A protein has these predicted regions:
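N-terminal binding-site loop/beta-alpha segment at the start of enzyme catalytic domains
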Residues: 1-78
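Acidic (Asp/Glu)-rich catalytic clusters
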Residues: 7-11, 41, 65-78, 113-117, ...
Length: 271
């Protein structure tokens, strides 16, 4: 397994185990622990969470069934989580919205730590830009969270270059990661300055949905069909699975991107 060193105290595996489907996959606590152990055997020590995954249930299951049952695993893994998205009904709201004021981020951080059964996460990301938010307030929250040791490092997710640089200008600590969509089908971040800005600042890039959300495998739109034909040819020539080619597309980029997997199946993870 290859790793990305983002600071003197943060090194993440280039393959990150995404935990968005922890609950939806219908696996038991024992199966989840088996999955975590298999990840570690493969060198995958980084796990991606968010409060909105299963409306908190995914973090809760990971905390209850992994870290409470086997506390020693905490020192072997890196936990990434996020904050800043309010789901419908959480605060009397009908629609999802993004909110990154100081008090909201502090409360979300505490709630995630409680669900995950840990006293800190290794990396906290602002999940989505809050276009009506005050970046100074967001920065104050991140500084306090790091100062209190609740998150060892911070970053963002889905930030445009100007949004990234604006928030960074209010911080005395670096934003170490920008998590973004990157795949053979979703290449827009190569052309809008997001990837270039990350490389300029030596910011880690964590690619979500590197398999295109599955649409390349089954989609009937022209782009999906064309990509599927080309990827199948390459996969056959190389003697590998098509998803391996899709991961390779992201991993070969000079930015040394990380990819977030979506499977909870240890066998698929190995492939």
């Amino acid at each position: 397994m290859q790793y990305v060193t983002l600071s003197d105290s943060l090194r993440l595996s280039r393959v990150v185990a995404g935990c968005m489907r922890t609950v939806g996959a219908g696996i038991s606590g024992e199966e989840l622990r088996t999955f975590v152990h298999r990840c570690l055997e493969l060198g995958i020590d980084s796990f991606d969470h968010a409060p909105v995954y299963g409306a908190g249930a995914c973090e809760q299951m990971f905390g209850d069934e992994v870290l409470k049952v086997e506390p020693s695993l905490r020192d072997q893994i890196k936990i990434v989580t996020k904050a800043g998205i309010i789901l419908p009904g959480q605060r009397g709201n009908r629609h999802i919205y993004y909110a990154s004021p100081k008090e909201n981020l502090l409360k979300e951080m505490d709630a995630s730590l409680k669900r995950l059964s840990t006293d800190h996460v290794d990396l906290l990301l602002i999940h989505r830009p809050d276009v009506l938010g005050d970046p100074e307030q967001t920065a104050m929250a991140l500084e306090q969270i790091v100062r209190e040791g609740k998150a060892l490092h911070v970053g963002v997710s889905n930030y445009e270059p100007s949004q990234f640089e604006t928030l960074q200008s209010y911080l005395s600590i670096p934003l170490l990661v920008n998590q973004m969509e990157v795949s053979v089908k979703a290449t827009y971040n190569f052309f809008n300055g997001v990837v270039d800005t990350a490389m300029k600042h030596k910011t880690g890039i964590m690619a979500w949905s590197p398999l295109g959300g599955g649409s390349v495998f089954a989609g009937q739109d022209e782009q999906s069909v064309r990509l599927r034909e080309t990827l199948s040819e390459i996969a056959e020539a190389k003697g590998v699975a098509m998803d391996t080619v899709m991961y390779a597309f992201v991993l070969r980029h000079p930015a040394k991107m990380m990819v977030i997997t979506g499977t909870m199946n240890p066998q698929r993870l190995q492939n």
